[in-house]
Amino acid sequence: MTLPKKYQQAMQDLLGEEYSAYIESMQQRSQTAIRINTAKISLEQWAEICPFKTKPVPWTEKGFLTTDEQCNPAKHPYYYAGLYYIQEPSAMIPASILPVHEGDRILDVCAAPGGKATELAAKLRGTGQLVANDISVSRAMALAKNLQIAGAVNAVVTAEKPERLQESFSQYFDGILIDAPCSGEGMFRRDPHMVQDWEEKGPQYYAPIQRDILKAAYQMLREGGYLVYSTCTFSPEEDEKNILWFLRQFPDMHVCEVPRKEGFCSGITDAALTETERQQLSRCVRIFPHKTVGEGHFAVLLQKGDSSAVEQESNSVEQENSLAERVHDHGFRMAEKKHQSSGAGRRSKYDGTRQQRLSGKKDRRRMDGDNDLAVKATWWTGCLSAPGAERYRL
């Protein structure tokens, strides 16, 4: 694999004396790891039936590196049963550092193919509400399948731009995870094809997209709620500089301290910043392949406002502003807009149903924890307005 000269120079500037160690690590094999799905099996039960030779991933008790080169976790029946998810070790960090409590409302903004969403669902333990979104319909279909295999409940898959979600979920979520689209520098070793993508669309292409996602997420996060922003790139333009911009744009956001685990490096700071800004950015987490078992990664945990001064809102799905209600409203609005834009003069077929629902004459079909998976096209296709959304029926 040949790295672009521009990238090599950027990494030399970033790593200094450690650059040679980084280049050497790029010749080593990527690690295979699995994350146990505690929605289906406890860690104690897994220890009794584990068919692989493994060792722990440093930053999560649910993660294990497979040490037997002959084993293939993707071929084992336990994989198809949803007992574990095959995931790159560093990719386990974002969902592990997002505080999730039973009953919370959680949003995974860029969720496909589902590695982080399935972990968030497991942390909710069958309660609360999980919205797993991906702008790509085809990728969202894979996401829905993985959530189903994982046994996720109270989950809904959407295929919307974050700005569109913002219209229906203002200050709604207790926790939001953004595993942002990025230049993928941290994945060059695992997927050399990412190098070509980097040359075509580098940090300068992705940084504005990431900021738009951050802005939308801020509007959807409730006071006192938590936000995790992560990338699989080393570029400060997509990492610390984006967070610095975000903090300056929204002064009520602050970076939270994340317990330091083996392999965690602090975020990059600059002498030109204020002491407070340097302190905040240093709390970011960086992963480098020459220092630990995973690929390159960046993650940061932020909070909106002061949690000690914020009273936790009720997370009951029976309250008036439930997830089901908001998704229904969003779906009706999208259908009505489509109808109006078509120029048809007749009354929308949705109007009567909406009036019945609002008057209490029609079942609201709220999310129910007894459902195997609340990702059902008969309920949610209004929110999935992209072409092909009807294929989400499971």
Predicted regions and their residues:
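Polybasic, low-complexity RNA-engagement segments
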Residues: 1-49, 295-298, 305-394
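Conserved class I S-adenosyl-L-methionine
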Residues: 103-112
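Helix-to-beta-strand junctions that scaffold the AdoMet/dcAdoMet cofactor pocket
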Residues: 125, 221-223
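Conserved SAM-binding loop of SAM-dependent methyltransferases across substrates and taxa
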Residues: 113-126
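A short acidic, Gly/Pro-enriched loop at the edge of an enzyme's catalytic core
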Residues: 101-102, 166-177
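Conserved AdoMet
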Residues: 32-92
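S-adenosyl-L-methionine
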Residues: 135-170
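Mobile active-site "lid"/loop adjacent to the S-adenosyl-L-methionine
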Residues: 138, 174-216, 228, 232-240, ...
